[in-house]
Design a protein with these regions (language model features):
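Short-chain dehydrogenase/reductase
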Residues: 97, 145-156, 187-194, 218, ...
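Residues that form or immediately flank small-molecule/cofactor binding pockets and catalytic motifs
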Residues: 61, 141, 180, 213, ...
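C-terminal substrate-binding subdomain of Rossmann-fold SDR/epimerase-dehydratase oxidoreductases
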Residues: 20, 201-325
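N-terminal Rossmann-like NAD(P)+-binding domain of SDR-like oxidoreductases, especially those catalyzing
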Residues: 1-178, 228, 289, 305, ...
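Short aromatic-enriched loop/helix-cap "lid" or pocket-rim segments at secondary-structure transitions
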Residues: 43-46, 132-134, 183-187, 221, ...
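Hydrophobic alpha-helix immediately C-terminal to the catalytic Tyr-X-X-X-Lys motif of short-chain
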Residues: 154, 158, 162, 192, ...
């Protein structure tokens, strides 16, 4: 039986967006995907492209008319479209600003005018900037350390203003180092987990930025899907018009990540256990440590992450081994 609720997922051909599309289609929602395929991939959509409840709009959030077309008849927006990556933003701050701020504002305006019920958007842990306090608590942020971090913080400011001024319900999800199936291992700005997995599978030595003691709150994709669903469906009025950390709530050093990857990949190829890693300089704009408090999400949204970092990593490794070999 088809669900009559219609969801727009911007950036729906990307890593997180395509996983959201697949999940909500499995729940019989009507799903519209808006993507310009600058970083997303059509192969991420193959599994459900013929689903009668799925509609693809090839467009760009930098064009207001594309946004207006995409939100027609939509109940909820899950806004994932953005140019990610701190290094990319340092190399090209103008395009990052155009997509992440101007594009975001276009989506807010289009959603407001179409009377969308709720606008859930991908915020970022980079907003915490130079704040050294751990764990990260939503109301206590530092100064941004990169153009990317600035754009994601401005998103939060715009969302807050649209909530207060126009009555548009918004919820921001500060993603912490999301990983899992469909995450692209290729390209100059590939995330660390798929990049390391691919290098190990090719029997290459991964290059670790710094001494490997930097730590991250790595978050499996299914926890992110869970948070998007909770944000979309909550009827708790205290839970809307705010931001939430979206993570597991534990941190893992890069050295430990390497250890786990070698252990899990060795189940498929024992020789991977003997591959050494190379250590290089720290990366500009990177924060040393990231650990998230998920207390607020638990209290207001009922969030209890289904996957630990290690259980999620095992699932991700299985997927990569099956799909990248």
């Amino acid at each position: 039986m088809t669900n009559n609720i219609k969801i727009l997922i911007t950036g729906g051909a990307g890593f997180i967006g395509s996983n959201l599309c697949e999940y909500f289609l499995s729940k019989k929602y009507k799903v519209v995907c808006l993507d310009n395929f600058s970083t997303g991939h059509k192969h991420n959509l193959i599994a459900f492209s013929n689903n009668e409840n799925f509609k693809l709009i090839e467009g760009d959030i930098r064009n207001l008319s594309d946004c207006e077309e995409a939100v027609q008849g939509v109940d909820y927006v899950l806004h994932q479209a953005a140019l990610g990556s701190v290094p990319r933003s340092i190399n090209d701050p103008i395009t990052t600003n155009d997509v992440n701020i101007s594009g975001f504002l276009n989506m807010l305006v289009a959603s407001r005018d179409a009377k969308v019920k709720r606008f859930i958007y991908a915020a970022s842990s980079s907003t915490y900037g130079d704040s050294e306090s751990l764990p990260k608590i939503e109301e206590k942020i530092g100064r941004p350390l990169s153009p990317y971090a600035i754009t994601k913080y401005v998103n939060e400011l715009y969302a807050e203003i649209f909530s207060k001024t126009y009555g548009l319900e918004t919820i921001g999800l500060r993603y912490f180092n999301v990983f899992g199936r469909k995450q692209d291992p290729n390209g100059a700005y590939a995330a660390v987990i798929p990049k390391f997995v691919m290098q190990f599978m090719e029997h290459k030595s991964p290059v670790v930025n710094g001494d490997g003691n930097f730590s991250r709150d790595f978050t499996y994709i299914d926890n992110v899907i869970q948070m998007n669903e909770l944000a979309m469906t909550t009827i708790n009025t205290e839970a809307i018009n705010t931001v939430y950390n979206t993570a597991y709530g534990d941190r893992t050093t890069l050295n430990d990540l390497i250890k786990y990857l070698k252990e899990y990949l060795s189940e498929f190829d024992a020789s991977i256990a003997n591959i050494s890693v190379t250590y290089g300089p720290n990366r500009a704009g990177d924060i040393p440590h990231s650990l998230d408090s998920i207390e607020k999400a638990g209290k207001l949204l009922g969030y209890e992450p289904k996957f630990s970092m290690q259980s999620g990593l095992k699932e991700a490794v299985k997927w990569y081994w099956k799909n990248l070999k």
